[in-house]
């Protein structure tokens, strides 16, 4: 990985918003804050930027039917996506061109669950709305927590058909515990070769144990000269975990040396971590 040129992303929105709010939103996760306490989203962005982030990510990870339906908010999807885009864009504008906005394109069902990945036609229907409504607000698209080759195809094909001309960053989630395979068990090289047909600008890993990410980056370096990066979890994800069930994840503390091996951190990481 080329450490002479680094881009610092932001970190977790969902956990940080929940911590500040002291409320327990489960079903719709961070999307609830677009309806209530939306000022907190801007505050979190500002703190990440003050700590060195050069990119902020739209709060659209859970503005999709699978999450919104848990609270009967499916009809609010378009409005919530637009509001998320506006908040991110308005925050970036305050910094006079120094901050880029990444449009978050998430899995369409639970994260970390390749067994729940939709087929292409089902995915196109939802991604089309998300991409179309985000496009006026973002500088590039960040496909996050992608867990299989099929999900890779689903999201990249959707972006190709929309044809916005904006860069695409593709971020896979790997199996935890020092693995270099996607959560589907498929290899990084196989996923990369499929993705290259769509020519994304950058490849990343996210929502994964740091040890697996370190191993994955070594392999990714051998495959491409494009931008590569990572934003790991500080916990490991057990099999069968979902946002709503009671299966507990295992939190890990990391040293500063382990931190700087990655471009950014994600879930359960706070703005203050960046000021090391």
Residue ranges of each PLM-predicted region?
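Active-site glycine- and acidic-residue-rich loops that bind
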Residues: 142-153, 204-219, 275
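Catalytic-face loop-and-helix region of soluble metabolic enzyme cores
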Residues: 175-183, 187-265
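Single conserved hydrophobic/aromatic residue that forms the stacking wall/gate
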Residues: 267-276
């Amino acid at each position: 990985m080329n450490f002479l040129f680094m881009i610092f992303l932001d970190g977790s929105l969902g956990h940080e918003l929940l911590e500040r709010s002291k409320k327990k939103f489960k079903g719709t996760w961070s999307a609830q804050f677009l309806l209530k306490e939306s000022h907190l989203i801007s505050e979190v962005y500002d703190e990440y930027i003050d700590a060195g982030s050069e990119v902020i990510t739209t709060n659209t990870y859970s503005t999709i039917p699978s999450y919104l339906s848990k609270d009967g908010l499916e009809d609010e999807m378009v409005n919530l996506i637009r509001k998320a885009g506006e908040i991110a864009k308005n925050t970036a504008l305050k910094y006079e061109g120094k901050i880029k906005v990444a449009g978050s394109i998430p899995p369409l069902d639970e994260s970390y669950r390749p067994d729940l990945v939709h087929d292409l036609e089902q995915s196109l229907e939802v991604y089309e709305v998300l991409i179309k409504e985000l496009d006026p607000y973002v500088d590039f698209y960040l496909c996050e927590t992608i867990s299989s080759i099929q999900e890779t195809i689903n999201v990249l094909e959707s972006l190709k058909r929309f044809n916005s001309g904006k860069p695409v960053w593709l971020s896979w989630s790997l199996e935890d515990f020092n693995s270099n395979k996607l959560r589907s068990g498929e290899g990084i090289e196989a996923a990369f070769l499929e993705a290259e047909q769509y020519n994304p600008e950058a490849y990343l890993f996210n929502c994964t144990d740091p040890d697996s990410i370190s191993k994955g980056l070594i392999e990714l370096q051998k495959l491409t000269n494009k931008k590569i990066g990572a934003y790991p979890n500080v916990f490991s994800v057990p099999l069968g975990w979902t946002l709503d069930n009671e299966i507990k994840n295992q939190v890990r503390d990391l040293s500063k040396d382990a931190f700087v091996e990655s471009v950014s951190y994600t879930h359960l990481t706070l703005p203050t971590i960046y000021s090391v």
